[in-house]
Amino acid sequence: MGRQAALAVTLLFVTSFTGCFGVESDGNLFDEDHEKEPLRINHIQMKGTHNSYHVEPLFSPTREYMYTHQTLDLQASQQGVRQFELDVWWDVRGGLRVYHNQYDSGTTCPTFEDCLGTLLEWSNENPMHHPLFIWVEPKDWPEQAADVTTTLEISGLLGDIEQEISNFWPLNQTITPDDVRGDGDNLRDAIGENGWPL
């Protein structure tokens, strides 16, 4: 896994809404006999946060780190956030950890499981919510020396992330890129042929 490889894993938490009511030009709802087209994932616009777990460090080395997000559940309930981005690192002492980098490690949910648990609890308490999108960005460590900079490859990190998701989050409440791809050769062709999920 290269450092330049940006992400990878997306989760869509299934909601009970599979369609929406249309509105006529005069502002009235269509009557029940009017044909309603199901709402697909790509019809949804949402508010998202970057480094969704972030807590401003006590001594910030740069102005870019000078912000703090509310906890994930409060972002969802109070701010209407439906897209979250998590940076996931593998730590030999603690498994999958969530933070920005070694100089900016403040976080509202220290482990990947903590983050998933917070969102799962909110989702279960709000069963009619629109889908949540979770972007998971796997991270690896740069090893720097006077004359060389290399990347420490973390074998199996993606597999560990996918395993933790499948162990922790109910499969009937997730949609992954593999689910959308199905039997297609690739994600792009599958979407072109079948469209985005309802």
What are these regions (language model features)?
Residues M1-L29:
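Secretory targeting signatures
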Residues N28-L198:
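Catalytic cores of phosphodiester-bond hydrolases, prominently lipid phosphodiesterases
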